[in-house]
Amino acid sequence: MAEPGIDKLFGMVDSKYRLTVVVAKRAQQLLRHGFKNTVLEPEERPKMQTLEGLFDDPNAVTWAMKELLTGRLVFGENLVPEDRLQKEMERLYPVEREE
């Protein structure tokens, strides 16, 4: 089943390939930082119904697509280099290392 808003997402990019790359990179960032770096407000977060109740959906791709739909993420050329951005993200949202 297609995600709601997929047509709007396709309209935001010049190709399906670019959309795939943008969503995948954002999903990777969300997973790396435990979703602490999301731009979604609590009431906007994707939900999943389980037998125990309604919980945040653990699917990072769904979160990334929903974030793009809000228009609060910037993607494209001439942005901060990815390595510099990664260092800043690690400073803001430290990754807990398993020992």
Swiss-Prot record:
HAMAP family: RNApol_bact_RpoZ (MF_00366). It comes from Thermus thermophilus (strain ATCC 27634 / DSM 579 / HB8). Belongs to the RNA polymerase subunit omega family. It is an enzyme of class 2 (transferase). Gene3D superfamilies: 3.90.940.10. This is DNA-directed RNA polymerase subunit omega. Pfam families: RNA_pol_Rpb6. InterPro entries: DNA-dir_RNA_pol_omega, Pol_omega/Rpo6/RPB6, RPB6/omega-like_sf. The RNAP catalytic core consists of 2 alpha, 1 beta, 1 beta' and 1 omega subunit. When a sigma factor is associated with the core the holoenzyme is formed, which can initiate transcription. It comes from the Bacteria. GO terms for cellular component: DNA-directed RNA polymerase complex. GO terms for biological process: DNA-templated transcription. It catalyses: RNA(n) + a ribonucleoside 5'-triphosphate = RNA(n+1) + diphosphate. Keywords: DNA-directed RNA polymerase, Nucleotidyltransferase, Transcription, Transferase. Promotes RNA polymerase assembly. Latches the N- and C-terminal regions of the beta' subunit thereby facilitating its interaction with the beta and alpha subunits. Its EC number is 2.7.7.6.
